[in-house]
Amino acid sequence: MWIGIISLFPEMFKAITDFGVTGRAIKQNLLQIECWNPRDFTFDKHHTVDDRPYGGGPGMLMMVQPLRDAIQVAKQVARSEDGVEAKVIYLSPQGRKLDQQGVRELSANRKLILICGRYEGVDERLIQSEVDEEWSIGDYVLTGGELPAMTLIDAIARFVPGVLGKQASALEDSFAEGLLDCPHYTRPEVLDNMPVPQVLMSGNHEQIRKWRLAQSLERTWLRRPELLDSLALTDEQRVLLAKIKQQYKIS
């Protein structure tokens, strides 16, 4: 997978290019990341990349020309190898809120270009002409789009074949099936008088599977019940959830 990044602070992305799962994926050529800095597309001696908004108000906007030129170069690089166009994403609080389903959808793209805004944002006309989709990582404001972009890259990379040592890991993550993850345990068998659940020691894979599913359902119902509203539960899940509610004396 190829990801192009438009950012005034490309150095920030060393956090994902040099470390962890994404860093290994890049070394193995499973993931390719290239950055373009709009400052490199300016023509004045100060490398100006911001300008005042029409209508007044506090703050500045990113200048159109350097940003658009950077996007155009990224698009050209994306299509130069095999003619495949990259989908252009603008990280914005006004965008669709990122969830696991969204991550799956985005991971199906071979090429993405992520635009990281700064200041008070970018000219609306640039969004209309250059951006395919807007995405948000939550209902809060950050100083720039770099951290959301890194979050998006990390989440997407888990679905790139070969990035994880075991592909099942991505399928079993929290939210992979719309449910929160079940509890996990490792050694020692007893920690501060708290033992590992006996079913996990049994070696019975079917019982372990059912226990984990029940735990995921219970956690989701207790902590994020709204997630269940959008799920088409299987017969097994409905039965387990009914038993869980009965245990809490709620029908």
Swiss-Prot record:
Top-level taxonomic group: Bacteria
State where S-adenosyl-L-methionine binds.
Answer: 117, 137-142
Cross-referenced InterPro entries: Alpha/beta_knot_MTases, tRNA_m1G_MeTrfase_C_sf, tRNA_m1G_MeTrfase_TrmD, tRNA_m1G_MTases_N, tRNA_MeTrfase_TRMD/TRM10
Instruction: Please give a single GO biological process term from the UniProt record.
Output: tRNA N1-guanine methylation
Q: Which GO terms describe its cellular component?
A: cytosol
Residues spanning the signal sequence = none
GO MF annotations, alphabetized: tRNA (guanine(37)-N1)-methyltransferase activity
List the keywords (alphabetical).
Cytoplasm, Methyltransferase, S-adenosyl-L-methionine, Transferase, tRNA processing
Question: According to its UniProt record, where is this protein located?
Answer: Cytoplasm
Give the Enzyme Commission number.
2.1.1.228
Enumerate the catalysed reactions: guanosine(37) in tRNA + S-adenosyl-L-methionine = N(1)-methylguanosine(37) in tRNA + S-adenosyl-L-homocysteine + H(+)
Write down the NCBIfam families for this protein, in alphabetical order: PRK00026.1 (NF000648), trmD (TIGR00088)
Q: How does it assemble?
A: Homodimer.
Q: What PANTHER family is this protein classified in?
A: TRNA (GUANINE-N(1)-)-METHYLTRANSFERASE
Q: Which family, according to the similarity comment?
A: Belongs to the RNA methyltransferase TrmD family.
Q: What does this protein do?
A: Specifically methylates guanosine-37 in various tRNAs.
Q: What is this protein called in UniProt? A: tRNA (guanine-N(1)-)-methyltransferase
Origin species, per record, is: Haemophilus ducreyi (strain 35000HP / ATCC 700724)
What phylogenetic lineage does the species belong to? Answer: Bacteria, Pseudomonadati, Pseudomonadota, Gammaproteobacteria, Pasteurellales
Q: Which gene encodes it?
A: trmD
